[in-house]
From Swiss-Prot:
Keywords: Hydrolase, Metal-binding, Zinc. This is Putative cytidine deaminase. It comes from Schizosaccharomyces pombe (strain 972 / ATCC 24843). Belongs to the cytidine and deoxycytidylate deaminase family. Substrate binds at N46, V47, E48. This enzyme scavenges exogenous and endogenous cytidine and 2'-deoxycytidine for UMP synthesis. Transmembrane segments: none annotated.
Length: 133
C-alpha cells in the first residue's frame, strides 16, 4: 500500500474506536479492512458482553461486516486500541487468514506510526481453505 493508503487506513481505524462497546474492560479496539481493489474501507470495533465468551474482537467485526456486504478478498487490515498498538489475537489471526493468505496487518500506534506484518508472519504454517480441498 502507498503512504496515502496507509494514512487513510489509520484514520479509519482511529475513527472506529469511538464505536467500541467495552464497559467491562474499558479496552477499546478498532479495526478496518481494505478491499483487494483498495476502493472500500470497512471498519469495526470490539463488542463486549457480560458473558465474556460472547465478546467479539474488532478485527472479526470488520471482517464479518465486510463479508456480509459481499467482500471476501482483502489486501490489508489495520488495528489499534485506544491505548495504542495491539496485535490480533489467535482467533482473529485465523479469521484473517480465512480470507487472504497474503494480507498485510498494520498494527498502529497512537501517532500513526505502525508495525506491519503479513498474516504468514503472525500465523506461520497456517491452516486455511486450501487445506480442505
Amino acid at each position: 500500500m502507498e503512504k496515502e493508503d496507509i494514512e487513510k487506513l489509520f484514520q479509519e481505524v482511529k475513527k472506529s474506536l469511538q464505536y467500541s462497546y467495552c464497559p467491562y474492560s474499558n479496552f477499546a479496539v478498532g479495526a478496518c479492512v481494505v478491499s483487494d481493489d483498495k476502493n472500500t474501507y470497512i471498519y469495526g470495533a470490539n463488542v463486549e458482553n457480560a458473558s465474556y465468551g460472547n465478546c467479539i474482537c474488532a478485527e472479526r467485526v470488520a471482517i464479518t461486516k465486510a463479508v456480509s456486504m459481499g467482500y471476501t478478498k482483502f489486501m490489508a487490515i489495520g488495528v489499534m486500541s485506544a491505548k495504542g498498538r495491539v496485535t490480533p489475537c489467535g482467533i482473529c489471526r485465523q479469521v484473517i487468514r480465512e480470507f487472504s493468505k497474503d494480507i498485510n496487518v498494520y498494527m498502529f500506534h497512537d501517532d500513526g506510526g505502525y508495525d506491519m506484518k503479513t498474516i504468514e508472519e503472525l500465523l506461520p504454517d497456517s491452516f486455511g481453505p486450501d487445506d480442505l480441498k
